[in-house]
Amino acid sequence: MVSLLRCQSFKPSSSLICSLALSAAFALSSSAFAEETKPAENKPATPVVSPPKATAQPANKNQVRFTKTGTFDGDSVVKLARKLASKPYVVLKDPLPAGLAKLSYDEYRDIRFNPVSSIWRDQGLPFQMQMFHRGFYFQDLIEIAIVEANQATHLAYEPKYFTAGEVITQALPNDDIGYSGFRIHNQLNTNGVYDELMVFQGASYFRALGKGNSYGLSARGLALKTADPEGEEFPIFRAFWVERPSYDSNLIVVHALLDSPSVAGAYRFSVRPGDNTQIDVEATLFPRVELSKVGLAPSTSMFLHSLNGRHDTDDFRPEVHDSDGLLMFNGRGEHLWRPLANPRQLQVSAFSDNSPQGFGLIQRERNYASYQDLEAHYERRPSLWIEPVGNWGQGAVVLTEIPTESEIHDNIVSFWKPRQPIPAGSEYHFAYRMSWGDEPVAKTNSVVVSRTASGRADIAKATPRRLFVVDYHLNGAMPDELPLAKVESSGGVIANVVIARNAANNGYRLAFELEPEDKELIELRAELKFSTPRQVETWLYRWTL
């Protein structure tokens, strides 16, 4: 496991490492704390501890900075963010007791939230909530408040809400040391069983699940200076306000306060679980400085290898990835599919657009046979689709692909980058809908890319020439006609373009060869043309040495 930086720092050496290492941290949050919260009638064998009671004052000298008990409304976090941004950035220092600050991986795993102490347990509500302890990678103090009837009540830390196993040698502190994050549970998969639905933990990272999913890719509140040579900046959600859900609602609302050296922000997450869990995000940014390298609606994922290119990977599994492609619906009505890659060198691609209709990192391959992993079950990882609300104007969908040799590293980042910088001192509002699940995108396409593979073109001997095979699937009956295939490249020579029916896939197979010549990087584009109008995905690809 890699070392994880604190992720609110922005040292030159930290930019990529922090982004990569968070996948290991989130793997921890999903495996070390993956108990099921049982329904009320299943009485636990351990003594029942009453759910945490929010208190007006912390239990120790630590100051409650943001989640003070008092009146709360929809503008409360916006006002806090505006006030925070009007002052210079302050590094908050909330040191943990030495024993907690230096916890090992196994020790931190041994501190678990006691499910019988879940917020709203035994109240018959559709949601429950559990908090994460501070320690190990998660050093920052995160404040949490519960909101009910327009009143926010600070949720103080108490050690009795956690259980410590035999690995922990010291007692948990009695002081209000805060939390490192929280997770929301819901009867997502089975009536009467509260499964994990969503997690907020680490910088501005969060994750969610659709029905039947296992945790995979992550989202962030904001991306700043991603892949910048001077280092990436990682904003942090410093405080959360969670609204008590109603009995008959399938909605839970979370408010969050974001902070970093460059910007403060207010976020509102409206979460609706389902086959594809929907999260409506409303955000207002208050930049302290001009934001010229900003990413809105960022997603972070992992791609190690697939049939698309294994390099020298020595792995019994055919494919290993949380996502296998970037899907984009642009403002011109095109639907674009860009397979992901694990390049030998850092690659950044920008897809210019005006008023994007949607984009997201998609896990399209859903067959177990493609992964053969009995533990990871990559076929269950959710896709994440982003739908902008309103006109986002000019900018680009940016895709960053980072070399990695291990699946514990997140090495894929995507986001929307506005064309114009966001001025210092301004208020920048944007909104979007997130859909997490197996099929979060409506099947509006009649022809979609189902598989991309590449390999050497010359069977007799190795040559630089590459063979590409792109399979298309039809949603509906296959027409009698064969489409025309158009393949373009930014360099090299395209040869031997062939299009054929693929009955096994209810679609077509496009094959062609690329002679790179002296190029080290070539952009490829393939389109299928039908005589009758059809919505057909355009295939994009970046070939590199």
Curated annotation (Swiss-Prot):
SUPFAM superfamilies: E set domains, Galactose mutarotase-like. The gene is opgG. One of its GO terms (cellular component) is outer membrane-bounded periplasmic space. The keyword Phosphoprotein does not apply. Pfam families: MdoG. GO terms for biological process: beta-glucan biosynthetic process. Keywords: Periplasm, Signal. Pathway: Glycan metabolism; osmoregulated periplasmic glucan (OPG) biosynthesis. This is Glucans biosynthesis protein G. GO terms for molecular function: carbohydrate binding; catalytic activity. Transmembrane segments: none annotated. It is found in: Periplasm.
